[in-house]
Amino acid sequence: MILNKILNFGIDKNYFIKKPIKQIKKSCCSLEEEIIDFDSTKEIICKEANQQTRKSCDGLCLKGSINFIEFKSLNNFFEKEFQYKLNQENIEEIEIIKEKVRNFNFKRKITDSLWLLDYILRHKDLSLKNNEIDECESIEKNYFIIKDEFQPLINLISNLNLLANESNNLKYRKIMDIEIKNSLDVLIKIELNKPKLIDCKQLEQILKEEK
């Protein structure tokens, strides 16, 4: 299959470094399944192509389909950054969330990630034939945003105030989910399936089902 050819080429040329998901730099999942550390791919290609640093997704999985993977630790955001801004700045909760989602810059990350992959596909040493290029273009391309599971009792022993705020925290998480999904809706394009916001368990299931 063409994906195996691309994967093997990427590994041989040191474009692709595979790591367990739990070892990917920004991972919020403790999964053993290996994927490509796409941040490393970005650094290697940008240096080789004499390009300014681009954005990229955190991971890439070439197995059955082309899966771009971005990790977002929402628990970490709500426990630290959100609480800090709520206490230190005169900003409404929803505006803090919207600002954070804008800063995620999903559009730039997937656009640059597609460019990085295209750079490899057009590499002279890979020498894909026309029918192989057509096959590659027909393969499904997915963009998954992976969130960690809601942890309402995080640091409860050291901060009992979280117990009273638990319902609010869950409410804010739901608002964040909606804002992320809304931002992903505008990214639908011909060569990309509708981006999805999923959790670690859903990611694990998707990767298991990939052939």
Q: What are the language-model segments listed below?
A:
Residues L74-P152:
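Catalytic cores of nucleic-acid endonucleases
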Residues E132-L207:
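Short, low-complexity, polybasic intrinsically disordered segments
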Residues K55-C57, N67, K141:
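Residue-level detector of short, conserved catalytic/binding motifs and their immediate flanks
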Residues G59-C61, S65-S73, S113:
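Conserved catalytic cores of phosphodiester-cleaving nucleases, focusing on short active-site segments
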Residues M1-R54, E204-K211:
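Basic, amphipathic N-terminal segments that precede the first structured/catalytic domain
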Residues K47-N50, C57-D58, L126-D134:
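Catalytic micro-motifs at enzyme active sites that drive phosphoryl/nucleotidyl and oxygen chemistry
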Residues C28-C29, C46, C57, C61, ...:
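Generic recognition of cysteine residues
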Residues R54-K55, R108:
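Generic alpha-helix structural propensity
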